[in-house]
């Protein structure tokens, strides 16, 4: 019995199936490619909005803001980690919350939210760059154009055919080009999965694809 036979037997005993794992990986790359293509336009819009939030920065939360906000609500004071339920006077409740560090807590919360926004923005940029790198490096100019018409401009096959010289493009060709474009993105994702620096993004993308099912 040679080493290959022994290794194969060990893999089977351990319940491992390299071929099945490979097939599962290929399915994920195909599903992820379609997900990225279909959400490409929305991702571009989201990037603009998140960039604006990040550029605006965190506005410091002041004591004046706290007094205004706390005065505007009639319930919920006792949700902070300070006992105020036994204080019936609203100004006294507000003073107790301020003394307990309410403003500082709010500033920490705002900074945490901005940090989360920055992480979301970085991940979003990576997804967009994945699509656009695949377009630049793995698609012809015509394929790029058809890809944008399908997924970005949401054109129908008939509209795409009409945009080209009559008789030069048919539905079957568009369908074939669409498959080639999606394969280009899948291939780029497969290549990116080899780099540990992208493992967290890959995990996030896998979860997003699962949620879409």
Per-region residue spans from a language model:
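Alpha-helical hairpin
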Residues: 138-139
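Helix-turn-helix DNA-binding module
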Residues: 153-173
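N-terminal interaction/assembly modules
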Residues: 1-134, 190-213
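The N-cap/first-turn positions of alpha helices
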Residues: 142-143
């Amino acid at each position: 019995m040679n080493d290959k036979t022994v290794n194969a037997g060990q893999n089977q005993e351990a319940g491992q199936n390299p071929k099945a794992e490979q097939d599962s990986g290929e399915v994920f790359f195909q599903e992820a490619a379609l997900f990225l293509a279909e959400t490409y336009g929305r991702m571009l819009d989201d990037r603009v909005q998140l960039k604006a939030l990040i550029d605006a920065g965190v506005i410091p939360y002041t004591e004046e803001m706290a007094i205004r906000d706390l005065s505007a609500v009639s319930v919920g004071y006792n949700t902070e980690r300070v006992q105020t339920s036994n204080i019936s006077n609203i100004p006294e409740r507000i003073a107790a919350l301020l003394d307990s560090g309410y403003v500082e807590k709010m500033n920490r919360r705002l900074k945490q939210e901005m940090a989360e926004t920055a992480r979301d923005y970085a991940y979003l940029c990576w997804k967009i760059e994945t699509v656009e790198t695949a377009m630049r490096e793995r698609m012809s100019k015509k394929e790029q154009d058809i890809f944008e018409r399908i997924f970005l401009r949401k054109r129908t096959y008939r509209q795409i055919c009409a945009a080209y010289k009559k008789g030069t493009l048919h539905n079957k060709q568009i369908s074939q080009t669409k498959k080639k474009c999606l394969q280009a993105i899948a291939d780029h994702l497969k290549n990116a999965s080899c780099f540990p620096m992208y493992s967290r993004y890959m995990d996030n993308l896998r979860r997003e694809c699962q949620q879409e099912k």
